[in-house]
Amino acid sequence: MNPNNQDLRTRFIFDDMPVRGLHVRLEEVWRHIVSRKQYPAAIRRALGELLAAGALLSSNLKLEGTLIMQVQGQGRLKMLVVEATSNQTCRATARWDETAQIGGNETLRDLLGENGVFVITVQPQDGEPWQGVVPLEGGSIAEMLTHYMLRSEQLETHITLAADGDTASGLLLQRLPEETLDEDAWAHVTALADTVTAEELLKLDAQHLLYRLFHETPPRVFEPETLEFACTCSRGKVSDMLLMLGGEEVSSIVAEEGSISVDCDFCNEKYVFDETDVNALFGADVVNAVREEQHRLQ
């Protein structure tokens, strides 16, 4: 492992109580994501927090696959999307009303408006996906996920998240299922976690942060895992999407515009298909038929 790598996820466990934890700190991954779009500060912060949360929760994937987390709303912010895989890769993007005024202090609920929802999908590499959709509870990504984990997973969880323009970080504590834990002990360890500041979460690595919080009852810390940005878009996937649209619609666009282009929301890669490409997808007969029909109607 590269000793200078700052995109790390670190597991830890307390030997004297049934509590496990995770710390994640993303620098290069996060900078790669925010360099692709000019995110308003409040949306950038919310997306970074969801990215850190996805990196934390994807560690629980028991099969090869992808965890997809979406926050959807009807306000100025339309959607946050994070995908994190069992191969320790992740990507993220957001959609918002680019004509709206968005500053740096708006809360998640301010941005989403009424009737926000949280959608979580587990997409195994082999097998059927599982999806849960719940109303948005809480005013932040951390509060939303805490409610979700308790209600849907029956796991008592404490999550702290932070993000700025350079770093996205998170800390998770979780009671081990089917283990007895004194309520005072859980209250104590979560109270210690509550003392962390956003600045500490963003600036300190796992070793220093865990010592700062839990030096009286130090946890056992495991070897960190390296996380990377990776986008799964491809020309082949865009071709499949165009095939689903149908030859008539795609050929009509190409006949009018000269080509059809599709941009990846996650990495901004542009895929351009001209008449030759569309001929290869649908056959020259389909394209020529559309062109002849357009000439007839003119």
Where are the model-predicted features located?
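Interaction interfaces in information-processing and related assembly proteins
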Residues: 2-223, 291-297
